[in-house]
Amino acid sequence: MDSTQVSFKSIFGGTPEPTDEVDAEPDPTQHGPHSFNNVTTTSAKLADENVAPFLAKHIPEQYAPLGSRTGKPEDLSSANSKYCYRHRPDLKCRRQADEPSMDKLQRDLETLPQSDQQGIAHIWSLFSAAPAKHRKLILQGLMAQCCFPQLSFVSATVRDLIRIDFLTALPPEISFKILCYLDTTSLCKAAQVSRRWRALADDDVVWHRMCEQHIHRKCKKCGWGLPLLERKRLRESKREIELRATTWDISGPSPTVTSTGEQQREQSAAPESSSSGKRKQDTSDEETAVVKRQCSSLAPDSENDDAFFKKRYRPWKEVYKDRFKVGTNWKYGRCSTKIFKGHTNGVMCLQFEDNILATGSYDATIKIWDTETGEELRTLYGHESGIRCLQFDDTKLISGSMDRSLKVWNWRTGECISTYTGHRGGVIGLHFDATILASASVDKTVKIWNFEDKSTCLLRGHTDWVNAVRVDTTSRTVFSASDDCTVRLWDLDTKQCIRTFHGHVGQVQQVIPLPREFEFEEHDAECENDNVSTVSDDPGSPAPQTTFGVSSIEPASQSSMFGPSFDNGRPAPPRYIVTSALDSTIRLWETTTGRCLRTFFGHLEGVWALGADTLRIVSGAEDRMVKIWDPRTGKCERTFTGHSGPVTCIGLGDSRFATGSEDCEVRMYSFQS
């Protein structure tokens, strides 16, 4: 092996193919005036004699052609004491060589005559062995002799060479922190850079953060909000995701390829775990037994285990992708419609969960439907008059009727479990949360039913029919809307009205507390001087603030604004509520100050039905139209028509909403892609 091959291998890490001595003879006709063909054998030997001492001086541990050294090596600390963080001249360069570039360089070198190869190798050897100061001098001399085309070539080459893969060089937790600042478009582009970037950019740590930032809320940076994800999964995965951010192995496989992340989420349901990457969660003995049975049944076959977890769980990037499609469909009104027909009179109330839809009608029946097939599963008979309100969960359905009664049903079997009477007029509104049931009646009262201690109480104060109620068990308060054009906030502990909201000039039909995640910016508020609420005449009720803007109230002080009973750390009621009335308007209120922040205009007649979450408000009115609103800007984003009668009830979900009408039909609009 000659000196050319030795130099190329030691400098660039390549392995040049053997050179044929016969084919390597120089061809004077193929080279320009800058060729090394004029170098004689004597000159080559002289160059060797000049280069060898230089190499032996600066890299004695790699090059010692003059004989092995027996003495103490020279102290190189003085020559190489100043170095940048990316390169140390006294050590081997830590930057990895680019294989395609090195292959091309090798091929180009082999096209030259042997003497030219030897001369170039000498230059490379000198530069490789030189200390930092010498290298700068060599580079300055070379640059001074370069013409403009050569300088342009150097500039283009250096632009790529000085780039470093900082995400791979940094610890994973810092890389995740950086990626969490990117938007979705930038993340997708980052995933195309390399395999390691894809492993980082597609990891659950990054996309879980993206889901938290956008799902069920408006992102302050981009203004986008995505439909609500199942909160249980979001909550249960958060701690495990945070742990993954600190234990991520960059050399491991991409989470988009394997199901490791999904396995950890499933196995995290067990109270004990042998892996430090899996979170612990308290579960009941029965739940633990179920999990153990599942794990034991899957343990013998790892392939089945992977298939099971892949089937049950998806990476957070896939979740975001699905929610993004749904959000886009909401934005542009792309949806499918399904119509449910079966009632013989107007549909007055409805609710849907998963694939179950329950509807109540003036024909005194409740119907249970399968939303996937449109099939009527069963009809519940028992009320003697029209059904005005209903609500169901996994185990029961409670309905209220104009026959003055409340009934509790097993909606899966159609059996009526119990009947409650207590109102002197028809029941036209109800809402239950945990063990508290509130009912609204024609008799102008709100009745509270406590299933835990079997107690009841009446809340009096409205002067006309009470149309709707909402229970908030966190703050132990109840909202009520009435035909007396007011909305009241009641304290369940003191049984007193602590706030009355005035502003509507028509009968208030609906009141809905917005989720606590909802945020309203101060600059979005409208200054409406005539819409300041007042408080009731009950003693101890605090006076509301009448400032013409959204006050910046600290969370700790919000509770105290509702009276002395909230001073001891008791949670405050929901900060924002939405109401609708027969004055054809919808209003957004702040409960802490009692101010109307925004009024929504657009319906031609009274608004009977209302649905709301953190992203949108859906309303149905006497004008037979359904409108979707942005709660922050007040803009009507879309209007749906189709009903031939007034829209009387609305149910709102993450990717669909349902409307009921006096035309005896229920329409479900699905935005799921």
Swiss-Prot record:
Swiss-Prot/TrEMBL keywords: Repeat, Transcription, Transcription regulation, Ubl conjugation pathway, WD repeat
Pathway: Protein modification; protein ubiquitination
Extent of the WD repeats: 342-379, 382-421, 423-459, 461-502, 556-599, 602-639, 642-673
Start and end residues of each stretch annotated as Disordered: 1-37, 249-302
Pfam families: F-box-like (PF12937), WD40 (PF00400)
Known function: Component of the SCF(sconB) E3 ubiquitin ligase complex involved in the regulation of sulfur metabolite repression, probably by mediating the inactivation or degradation of the metR transcription factor.
Record's protein name: Probable E3 ubiquitin ligase complex SCF subunit sconB
Species of the source: Aspergillus terreus (strain NIH 2624 / FGSC A1156)
